[in-house]
């Protein structure tokens, strides 16, 4: 096992260990035991920067099911390293922050178990080269995030938000599964790198469009893109460390990673470029507009996260245009990938810090309601400083890193508007317009975020708690992120050669020469647009109280949340009605539906599919076999007219013993002996149990019931006979019996073929059958124990009375 595999598995192992440690170390905050895990992974990832800078990659394989092409294959390139650094780096700061945020009285064992589970799953997503393994980790992120969002399960809003996120992201996960299966069909491989190398085969496949649509749905749901964004605001009910981790740097970025990783395969399609770009721009505009009207600090950050994700998504879509050009023209559009990667990093820094400050404000004042907050500038000066730095970065104000990536975004929209590709030159003007409008509202909600908390009148009478500056443990992590905001803004070269260029090259192998970010490029369209954004933003802030009321009057039926809630209520009701229409309290009705469907499917298949019934290889029927079958049928027939349970049991046993005799004649003595033992034990058990039951009562049935029963029974019998004859006479595959005959001794070291098949070749099947019997036995034992317990309690009550 390689170090790369250990880096992925380490959080998963500690996720199992941490709850045990929690039982023995109650006095020490559990976060201190968790903190070394992401730090160690982060340090290890830093050592791999030189590898990716030199253009090399790391490929490690751990065999799992090689025959099916499912191995634990890990592939690390510039893109995987970038996300791994974000996952482990931000994860370290979040764990440190959580030590100050969560008290020891919380269920810390559960919290850190879920957090580490999520961390390992995210590392698995961004490092897996096998798409099936990627999917497994992808779904594990949905499951672990569900547990984290519902951590405070006593709150109804937490349960609602967790269920909502799970439903939408799992829907996307199923779409992703369908997409990757369609990708694997033409390439006959589950390797992502192999798919990229054979992208032309996928592009010529009839499944190409369907795979593209399904994978985009998977990415859009995970990264909260329009119209799937509705789960993210409700997920804010999670503890603030969860919001800072999942919803700024990791989970919501998984969809962006998937789009970036799959771009070499799908960039040849105009549908990919248009859809990814327009969905991103629409998300940017819609979410930034909605962020301005939120009354909850986390609500503002939730919609701002959605809008920033839309911005990055749009840049990834624009960058895909580079696949349709050569040389310098290709590099011009590939610069959008560079801008996307840079903003990916910047967003993790300023948004992570803002979430942590929001948690600090909530921890200090007891509320996140902007109507109750205000005037905290002098009370929380350190928090104010961090907020100003990070919020201005989000607004795109120099000299912070957000300004550089926002300028790059605007530049890419103007570049895309000039692309003479797929009629982009006629509609491309929408790109910069939507980008500018979205950036205006981004500026507005960023500045208002500062004003809501720290300016205005201080209202202590409306605060549940007396406001105060929080502890150093809660300030250290956002302070580090705020420092990075300044450093990356003033010295972006720290990232360009080491992180950004290798990550960009992983998306498009076009060489990006001398990537540079500057505060001022001259009077470019992007710079002039920035001035327009500032002017319009200030005007909207000044008139905020007038126009925001119009947004808050949005009819409920025009929101996606309304239709989600309506569907969540209507679908279960219709499902229940449909289920009740064919699943009733009468077992006979249920059996009629089941057996009727079997008969219908059998005869439809018989009359629609050509087949042969071949009796050439059928062995001759001997007289004693006929006698045994007659005995068997007679016993089964007499059960129908039995007037006592004892007679029914005897006839049923006769059927079983008759089958055992057939096994003897067919030279299967062990099987016959087993059948004899089972029948004997079953008969004894039936007799013991039925002894305690009341007498058997027979009810006269209507002739219509009797006729229906006879038709169903006859139809099922005929169907089974037909299926058996067709299966015997139409062997499209070579019989496996020869394999057993040839290998029963050398592989299993047994001479009895039946025993070897049951115990060795089909050992798992036998094991699970035994497990089912064991579970049934436990259920019976539990029922008996409960009955005895109730009888004992009843006797105690009587004695007390």
Swiss-Prot record:
Compartment annotation: Cell membrane
Transmembrane segments: 4-25, 30-49, 79-101, 108-127, 131-153, 166-188, 208-230, 243-265, 270-289, 302-324, 339-361, 373-395, 429-451, 472-494, 526-548, 589-611, 621-641, 646-668, 672-694, 707-729, 767-784
One Gene Ontology CC term in the entry: plasma membrane
Topology relative to the membrane: Multi-pass membrane protein
InterPro entries, A to Z: CPA3_Na-H_Antiporter_A, MrpA/MnhA1/PhaAB, MrpA_C/MbhD, MrpA_C/MbhE, ND/Mrp_TM, Proton_antipo_N
Entries under Pfam families matching the protein: MbhD, MbhE, Proton_antipo_M, Proton_antipo_N
Main location: membrane
Keyword annotations: Antiport, Cell membrane, Hydrogen ion transport, Ion transport, Membrane, Sodium, Sodium transport, Transmembrane, Transmembrane helix, Transport
GO MF annotation terms: antiporter activity
Biological process annotations from GO: proton transmembrane transport; sodium ion transport
Keyword Transport: yes
Coiled coil (UniProt feature): none
Keyword Cytoplasm appears in the UniProt entry: no
Domain of life, per lineage: Bacteria
Activity-regulation annotation: Na(+) extrusion is completely inhibited by the H(+) conductor carbonyl cyanide m-chlorophenylhydrazone (CCCP).
Family: Belongs to the CPA3 antiporters (TC 2.A.63) subunit A family.
Assembly notes: May form a heterooligomeric complex that consists of seven subunits: mnhA1, mnhB1, mnhC1, mnhD1, mnhE1, mnhF1 and mnhG1.
Entry function: Mnh complex is a Na(+)/H(+) antiporter involved in Na(+) excretion.
Protein name, entry field: Na(+)/H(+) antiporter subunit A1
Organism (species): Staphylococcus aureus (strain MRSA252)
């Amino acid at each position: 096992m390689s170090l790369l595999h250990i880096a992925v598995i380490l959080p998963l192992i500690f996720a199992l260990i941490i709850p045990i440690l929690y039982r023995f170390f109650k006095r020490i905050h559990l976060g201190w035991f968790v903190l070394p895990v992401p730090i160690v992974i982060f340090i290890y990832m830093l050592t791999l920067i030189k590898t990716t800078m030199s253009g090399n990659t790391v490929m490690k394989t751990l065999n799992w099911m090689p025959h099916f092409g499912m191995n634990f294959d890990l592939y690390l390139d510039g893109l995987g390293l970038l996300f791994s650094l974000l996952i482990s780096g931000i994860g370290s700061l979040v764990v440190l922050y959580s030590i100050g945020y969560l008290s020891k009285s919380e269920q810390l064992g559960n919290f850190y178990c879920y957090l580490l589970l999520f961390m390992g799953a995210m590392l698995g997503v961004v490092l897996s080269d096998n798409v099936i393994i990627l999917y497994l980790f992808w779904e594990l992120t949905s499951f672990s995030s569900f547990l984290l969002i519902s951590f405070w399960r006593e709150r109804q809003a937490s349960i609602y938000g967790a269920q909502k996120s799970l439903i939408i992201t799992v829907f996307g996960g199923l779409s992703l599964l369908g997409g990757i299966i369609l990708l694997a069909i033409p390439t006959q491989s589950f390797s992502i790198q192999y798919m990229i190398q054979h992208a032309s085969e996928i592009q010529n496949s009839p499944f190409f469009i369907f795979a593209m649509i399904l994978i985009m749905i998977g990415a859009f749901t995970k990264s909260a893109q329009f119209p799937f964004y509705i789960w993210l605001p409700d997920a804010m009910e999670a503890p603030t460390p969860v919001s800072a981790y999942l919803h700024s740097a990791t989970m919501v970025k998984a969809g962006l990673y998937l789009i970036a990783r799959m771009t070499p395969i799908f960039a040849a399609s105009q549908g990919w470029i248009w859809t990814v770009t327009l969905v991103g721009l629409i998300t940017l505009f819609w979410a930034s507009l909605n962020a301005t009207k939120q009354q909850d600090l986390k609500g503002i950050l939730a919609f701002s996260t959605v809008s920033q994700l839309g911005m990055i998504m749009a840049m990834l879509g624009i960058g895909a245009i580079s696949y349709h050009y050569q040389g310098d023209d290709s590099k011009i559009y590939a610069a959008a990938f560079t801008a996307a990667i840079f903003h990916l990093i910047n967003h993790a820094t300023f948004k992570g810090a803002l979430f942590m400050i929001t948690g600090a404000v909530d921890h200090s004042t007891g509320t996140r309601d902007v109507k109750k907050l205000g005037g905290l500038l002098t009370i929380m000066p350190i928090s104010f400083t961090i907020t100003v730095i990070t919020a201005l970065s989000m607004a795109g104000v120099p000299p912070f890193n957000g300004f550089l990536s926002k300028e790059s975004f605007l530049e890419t929209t103007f570049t895309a508007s000039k692309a003479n590709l797929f009629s982009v030159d006629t509609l491309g003007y929408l790109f910069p317009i939507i980008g500018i409008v979205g950036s205006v509202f981004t500026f507005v909600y960023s500045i208002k975020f500062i004003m809501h908390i720290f300016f205005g009148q201080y209202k202590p009478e409306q605060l549940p708690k007396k406001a105060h500056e929080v502890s150093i443990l809660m300030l250290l992590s956002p302070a580090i992120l705020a420092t990075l905001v300044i450093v990356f803004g003033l010295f972006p070269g720290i990232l360009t050669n080491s992180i950004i260029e290798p990550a960009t090259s992983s998306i498009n192998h076009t060489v990006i020469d001398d990537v540079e970010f500057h505060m001022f490029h001259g009077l470019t369209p992007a710079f002039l647009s920035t001035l327009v954004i500032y002017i319009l933003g200030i005007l909207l802030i000044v008139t905020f109280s007038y126009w925001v009321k119009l947004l808050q009057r949005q009819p409920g039926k025009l929101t996606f949340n309304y239709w989600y809630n309506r569907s969540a209520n209507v679908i279960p009701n219709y499902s229940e009605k449909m289920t009740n229409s064919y699943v009733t309290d009468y077992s006979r009705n249920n059996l009629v539906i089941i057996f009727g469907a079997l008969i219908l499917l059998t005869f439809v298949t018989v009359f629609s599919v050509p087949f042969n019934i071949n009796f050439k290889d059928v062995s001759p029927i001997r007289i004693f076999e006929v006698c045994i079958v007659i005995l068997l049928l007679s016993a089964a027939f007499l059960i129908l007219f039995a007037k006592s349970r004892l007679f029914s049991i005897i006839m049923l046993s006769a059927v079983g013993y008759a089958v055992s005799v057939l096994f003897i004649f067919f030279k299967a003595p062990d099987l016959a002996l087993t059948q004899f033992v089972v029948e004997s034990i079953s008969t004894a058990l039936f007799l013991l149990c039925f002894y305690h039951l009341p007498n058997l009562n027979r009810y006269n049935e209507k002739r219509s019931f009797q006729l229906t029963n006879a038709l169903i029974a006859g139809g099922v019998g005929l169907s089974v006979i037909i299926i058996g004859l067709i299966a015997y006479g139409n062997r499209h595959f070579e019989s496996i019996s020869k394999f057993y005959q040839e290998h029963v001794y050398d592989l299993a070291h047994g001479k009895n073929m039946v025993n070897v098949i049951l115990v060795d070749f089909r050992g798992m099947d036998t094991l699970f059958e035994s497990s089912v019997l064991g579970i049934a036995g436990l259920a019976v034992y539990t029922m008996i124990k409960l009955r005895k317990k109730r009888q004992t309690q009843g006797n105690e009550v009587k004695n007390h009375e």
